[in-house]
Amino acid sequence: MPRLRAPRGDGELLFWPPAEEWPALVERNRRRRIEFAVRSGGDDLRPFPLLHADAPARPDGTPFRPIHTSFDKPVIVTGHQAEPFHPGVWVKNFLVRRLADAVGGSPLNLIVDTDAPRSSVLAVPEIIDGRLAVAGVRFADLRTDTALCEQRLDRDLLRSAARQVCETVHDPDRCRGMGFWAAVVAAAGQEGTDAAEALSAGRIAAEAELLGRTNFELAVSRLPWAEFLRR
């Protein structure tokens, strides 16, 4: 494998292995899985039984679309911590959707809600004296020593953050781009919705607007690891 360097230019992407090799890799993994099942006596080796059942509800109360995929159809998986927005996450989610469509599989994003947040501040670009600067806008009072799935968001702070962002950028078009934030605020008001679910609701809303559809979503905290480890 060559030495990899993170791209520095605007809009540049790094793929390894090259994207054109991905369908062949999916097929190779599928064959290996079937061969392993045969060697082990044909046991059902699904590592994620939850994928074959009704998945947890979305933050807005509607159920996530359940994944009912047969043993020989691939599930293309990506994942990341729950953050308000992250270009790298969107790129990965768009790519797994494209790859899943190409190989007849299902695209799945794992929400890593068991990690603690690094910050409760949005980095917002602003122009000061004709020069680009970055302002910090606090959107929550999250603890950095506690998993996101164990915390909740305050709707008043979320609304205040949206107003501050618009006041900072001084650009109506960019303010309209904050429309997905309404999904975060709405989700945060749902009983039992944790911070990771609420933040993910905004990302999911943005992806639905851009793609017209969304990937399957599962939170890591809800995966049945105990059952998997017993197999």
Task: Spell out what each predicted region is.
Residues M1-A82, L132, D156-H170:
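N-terminal regions that are enriched for targeting/export leaders
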Residues P17, H80-V91, A187-A198:
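Conserved aromatic-histidine-acidic binding/catalytic patches
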Residues P56, I76-T78, P107-L110, V137-F139, ...:
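Generic structural hydrophobic/aromatic packing signal, biased to beta-strands
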Residues P66, P84-P87, A116-S120:
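Short active-site-adjacent helix-start/loop capping segments
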Residues F71-V103:
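N-terminal catalytic cores of NTP/NDP-binding nucleotidyl/phosphoryl-transfer enzymes
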Residues G79-A82, L110-D115, A219-L223:
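An acidic- and aromatic-residue-enriched active-site/binding cleft used to recognize and process polar
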Residues G104-D173:
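Compact, glycine/acidic-enriched structural inserts
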Residues P172-R231:
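Aromatic-residue-lined binding/catalytic grooves and analogous aromatic/hydrophobic interfacial grooves
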